[in-house]
Amino acid sequence: MKAQELRNKSVEELNGELVNLLGEQFKLRMQAATGQLQQTHQLKQVRRSIAQVKTVLTEKAGE
């Protein structure tokens, strides 16, 4: 998701998105640990998405 799309969302929506991403990251990490994850680039994508959401939340907290 692009940063501008994230900035247009409310804080509640961003928190919901963050919870979803953290759950997805947990599932991917478990798959990687058991050797079931074929597309390892997904871990990087989810980690980056989490960072983007947290950044936008911090920006909104400063407003």
From Swiss-Prot:
GO terms for cellular component: cytosolic large ribosomal subunit. One of its GO terms (biological process) is translation. InterPro entries: Ribosomal_protein_uL29 (IPR050063), Ribosomal_uL29 (IPR001854), Ribosomal_uL29_CS (IPR018254), Ribosomal_uL29_sf (IPR036049). Keywords: Ribonucleoprotein, Ribosomal protein. Pfam families: Ribosomal_L29 (PF00831). One of its GO terms (molecular function) is structural constituent of ribosome. It comes from the Bacteria. Belongs to the universal ribosomal protein uL29 family. This is Large ribosomal subunit protein uL29. The gene is rpmC.
